[in-house]
């Protein structure tokens, strides 16, 4: 009987000392889902109707998940023959960061470059939002693009279904491009 009591007491003590498993960080899951797409290209389409996006809507849109590392994923985004755009999602000490890397065909920086923002909260495993950061605001103001100083970008990854890129402004500006993850493309 004494052995049974000691065994039960020991089991209770060990259970009390056990830690509850830590819930997975949605940003870690999100970045892992991006990395799972590495090496693949997907065709997309504009699903919003803003007249400012007519060129995008009438062009072939292809993203290529490339340049993959545990803490950073680079995603070139081609609009027709224009291959100047690349999205870069990076893990930071405080969360995730989205930057827009714009270069000309020779690889030289052109126009606005490395603008974007950092997540303000944990987001979800499917969606992360990136309000414009102060560095980007300064770049937009210096370049006369004050309208962009309120940008909020979002990226979504729905495994086996869809990837989405969004740009929103409080003024009502809204661009959303959705990519079909069920059909990788060769080029």
Predicted feature locations:
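Short beta-strand segments that buttress and anchor functional surface loops
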Residues: 73-80, 100-101, 142, 165-168
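Short, hydrophobic/aromatic-rich segments at coil-to-beta transitions
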Residues: 38-43, 68-76, 96-97, 160-164
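Short, solvent-exposed loop/hinge segments that bridge or flank secondary-structure elements
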Residues: 43-70
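Edge beta-strand at a domain terminus
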Residues: 113-118, 160-187
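Tryptophan-anchored aromatic micro-motifs
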Residues: 26-52, 100
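An exposed acidic His-Trp-rich patch
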Residues: 87-139
């Amino acid at each position: 009987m004494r052995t049974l009591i000691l065994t039960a007491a020991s089991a209770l003590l060990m259970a009390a000392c056990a830690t509850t498993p830590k819930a997975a960080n949605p940003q870690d899951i999100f970045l892992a889902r991006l990395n799972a797409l590495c090496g693949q290209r997907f065709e997309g389409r504009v699903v919003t109707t803003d007249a400012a996006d007519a060129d995008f809507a009438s062009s072939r849109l292809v993203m290529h998940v490339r340049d993959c590392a545990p803490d950073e994923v680079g995603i070139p985004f081609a609009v027709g023959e224009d291959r100047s755009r690349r999205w870069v999602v990076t893990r930071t000490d405080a969360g995730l960061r989205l930057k827009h890397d714009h270069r000309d065909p020779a690889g030289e920086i052109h126009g606005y470059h490395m603008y974007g923002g950092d997540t303000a909260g944990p987001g979800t495993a499917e969606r992360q939002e990136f309000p414009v950061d102060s560095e980007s605001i300064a770049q937009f103001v210096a370049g006369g693009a004050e309208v962009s100083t309120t940008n909020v970008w979002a990226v979504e990854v729905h495994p086996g279904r869809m990837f989405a890129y969004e740009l929103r402004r409080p003024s009502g500006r809204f661009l959303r491009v959705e990519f079909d993850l069920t059909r990788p493309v060769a080029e």
